[in-house]
């Protein structure tokens, strides 16, 4: 499970983290869940830890942090273009298969824990 978040977000990002955590709960076991920062200027290890702790996802979702230059290839690989100076991004989940291929994408408003867990189970069977 890959999604894009920032730690100072008050709207969609907490909901996305809850959806990912709920999918892991529904699945019954953890699979790699990664949140890639879209706010490298403000996201730090401490803020990522606090954000994930508040979402009860610490240790279950892993935050990828770095500089704009370091994160840019990841954003491009998933067709995410964070806007600066205000941070705006598309709320989206991407499921990646065992070989590292992007297989299923969900707009954030269409993703539910049940739907993500269902499709994760399908990918695990492959």
At which residue positions do the language-model features occur?
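Thiol-/selenol-based redox modules, centered on thioredoxin-like
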Residues: 86-126
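Structural micro-motif
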Residues: 60-61, 72, 78-94
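Hydrophobic beta-strand anchors of alpha/beta hydrolase catalytic cores
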Residues: 1-2, 33, 93
